[in-house]
Amino acid sequence: MASKKGDPEELYVRQEKIGKGSFGEVFKGINKKTNETIAIKTIDLEDAEDEIEDIQQEINVLSQCESPFVTKYFGSFLKGSKLWIIMEYLAGGSVLDLMKPGPFDEGYIAIILRELLKGLEYLHSEGKIHRDIKAANVLLSASGDVKLADFGVSGQLTDQMTKRNTFVGTPFWMAPEVIKQTGYDSKADIWSMGITALEMAKGEPPRADLHPMRALFLIPKDPPPTLEGNFSKGFKEFCALCLNKDPNQRPTAKDLLKHKFIKAAKKTSSLTDLIERRQKWLQLNGNNADDENDDLDRDAKSNEEDFGWEFPTIKQKSPVAVQEQQQTPQKPTVVSTPIKEQQQQQQPTPVTTPQQPVTTTTTTPTTETKVRSLSNSSQTTPVKTTVAATTAPATTPASNAPTSTTPNGAAVTQQQAPRASALTSVIYPVLSKLLKNTSDENVINALAQLKMAFDNAEKAKPGITHSLIAQIIETLKR
């Protein structure tokens, strides 16, 4: 997506900060020409070098969406290393903001879910998956219109790719198949919407009292959460349909719009009651009450720091990039290379390392180079190749890969089974963080040996890392 030239401050007046979105801060603003109120997301690309691909993904998705149920995108501007993304201003705030005074009555929940389903029906019909549905990413206008926001981790499904394998989302809202990396499709959004329904009814998602890492182990293992309490049979049934652990048994957004609980929902104008409720709550508690650290996402982020996780939203490269290897890890280096569209993308070149771990220096493009890639046409996408606590990918001849057929008859090459998510999503990030924070050669060598030990153990007995971490968590609980 091309960014516009010129100084955005000549076109817009940036006013007070109104929140934080994926990658940056969000301000209220005014279009000088039309006097229209808009939202301005500002991102310092020098501070977000590793997220440039994801930022461009959000811009690409927003620019392609034309729906009354998705936040409008008006354009983006580069000023030095600062990126301005101009979007529709939604004065009602997020559903999470509106929940600060307390959970919602189910009548309001039904309205929000209906509008959310309309947004998902549109996205899914366009072959897109949101992948981060939660109350914080659902916004309201002053008149009660409901819109989906925050597309930083959205995915695109094509005829040649019926299921994705990337590990993304926010832990408490993640579908079991996403965590297990068995491949997923738009039904993952339906699960997350079911969790969001429970969040609105109870004030927080299931397992919110647990560390996010423990939640990741329990979600695929335990029975699905249910809506308990004084709620209607229709609402409980709706949640149960969304939270079926078998994605093939979950209804589509289109089907759920026909559910009796949704069909009985009132007009969106009723949601202005929630906006007024929050305004009264702010008057009683002071405007600073909105800034308190009671956001579950922020709590999760502070809890995870000891484990080397990056919450609230996780995005991991496709498991294909972490296939079995026999090579020695290096000090982490991130290389960002602009390449043509994904159909021209080649497998990363395997990295040859010496027998003993050493610290290597790799010339990396500057932030300025990455920033320029955002200004180019949509034919160029910056892609990150990470040489970190992962090893180089093994190349598998396409001719040996099993194939299947999509419903429309297109041949699909199935990806090899991904490595254990515990190894690629827990051990590697922790080792990478430890490696980044030390210059002691003894520590570096020890970490390299530790990683090799995990690699060898996982190769000898797939899933052993998951079992080990699960046992550690059980021990710590005692």
Curated annotation (Swiss-Prot):
Q: Where is this region: Disordered?
A: 306-410
Q: Which reaction does it catalyse?
A: L-seryl-[protein] + ATP = O-phospho-L-seryl-[protein] + ADP + H(+); L-threonyl-[protein] + ATP = O-phospho-L-threonyl-[protein] + ADP + H(+)
Binding positions for ATP? I18, G19, K20, G21, S22, F23, G24, E25, V26, K41
Q: Is Signal given among the entry's keywords?
A: no
Stated EC number for the protein is 2.7.11.1
Q: How is activity affected by pH?
A: Optimum pH is 7.5.
After translation, the protein is modified as follows: Autophosphorylated.
Q: A GO term (biological process) for this protein? A: protein phosphorylation
**Which regions span the lipid bilayer?**
none
User: What regulates this protein's activity?
Assistant: Phosphorylation of severin is reduced with high concentrations of calcium ions.
Q: Please state where this protein is localized.
A: Cytoplasm, Cytosol; Nucleus; Cytoplasm, Cytoskeleton, Microtubule organizing center, Centrosome; Cytoplasm, Cytoskeleton, Spindle
Instruction: List the catalytic residues.
Output: D132
Task: Tell me the name of the encoding gene.
Answer: svkA
The record's annotation in InterPro entries points to: Kinase-like_dom_sf (IPR011009), PDC10_dimerisation_sf (IPR046409), PDCD10_N (IPR048288), Prot_kinase_dom (IPR000719), Protein_kinase_ATP_BS (IPR017441), STE20/SPS1-PAK (IPR050629)
In this chain, composition skew of type Low complexity spans 341-368, 380-408
Family matches, as Pfam families: PDCD10_N (PF20929), Pkinase (PF00069)
Bias category Polar residues: which stretches?
323-340
Q: Does the record's keyword annotation contain Nucleotide-binding?
A: yes
What cofactor does this protein call for?
A: Mg(2+); Mn(2+)
All disulfide bonds of the chain are none
Name of protein:
Serine/threonine-protein kinase svkA
Give the UniProt family note: Belongs to the protein kinase superfamily. STE Ser/Thr protein kinase family. STE20 subfamily.
Keywords of this entry? Actin-binding, ATP-binding, Cell cycle, Cell division, Cytoplasm, Cytoskeleton, Kinase, Magnesium, Manganese, Metal-binding, Nucleotide-binding, Nucleus, Phosphoprotein, Serine/threonine-protein kinase, Transferase
GO CC annotation, single: cleavage furrow
The disruption phenotype is: Defects in cytokinesis, leading to multinucleated cells caused by failure to sever the final connecting bridge between the 2 daughter cells. Cells also display defects in development and directed slug movement.
